[in-house]
Amino acid sequence: MYYGYLAAGGRDKERIIRTAISIELIHIFLLIHDDIIDRDLKRHNLKTVNSYYTEIGRRLFKKFDANHFGNSMAIIIGDMIGAMGNKILFDSGFEPKNIVKALSQLQYVISYTVVGESQDLYIEYLGKANEQEVLRMYENKTAKYTIEGPLHLGAILAGAPDKLINQLSQYAIPVGIAFQIQDDILGIFGSEKKLGKTVGSDIAEGKQTLLVIKAREKCNRLQKRILNSCLGNKNLKTSDIDEFRKVIRETSALEYAQSLSQKLIRQGKNELDKFPIEKEAKIFLDDIADFMIKREL
């Protein structure tokens, strides 16, 4: 949000920094709900909200369903944090017309993220997808709220014209998709300590990521058997994850995903060069795009 504001020529840096808390709270709200959907127990090397309250439920309310208690509390807390994010934006003190426009845009971002979540869940349960469907899901689920949405909100609060808003999208969408591809790679090949969550959780949940669908396209019979035995298996062993990784490498799915993410980053950076924005914002957006695919495995 901060650099979207600067990109559009905004000058009140202190105010936009305070206001940027709003998008962080919206981010947390979405992640809390995402953890419930994905049944994740760990994030940022800490218990997820649903996991934390499930443990409380087991300890205090032995006659009741602890998982339901944990998930219910997480939904409530997520909703409350989302409302706080909206309130901070509403009370930000920018031009009223810009605040109204930004709040409207924020609801658009949340709506598309929810659509992306539903696409992710549907594809997971269906057990198959093509590349176009997966990339469209990545755009809705991730690119909208991680990159495009914050840039738009900041630019809108600075009074940016619609032309600049649209130009920022040309940068944000490919970079946001590349971010999700790298996230998928880290989810299988990354360090659990650095990742802050369980490596292999996407495999256990049966996520139909770009890596999975490309591996399916090129796998032989034995490799297909390994993929099918691991995906959706809640009792994965380290040896199972190692075998899964081996298939992803041998089918060149990893190489394909890395190549596509690099291509998307180049696309986003090239778009950034096509329109005039403030130098500080341009330098940051250029650097953060590179960082998206350099996050450590």
Question: What are the residue ranges of the model-derived segments?
Answer:
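All-alpha prenyltransferase/terpene-synthase fold signal
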Residues: 1-297
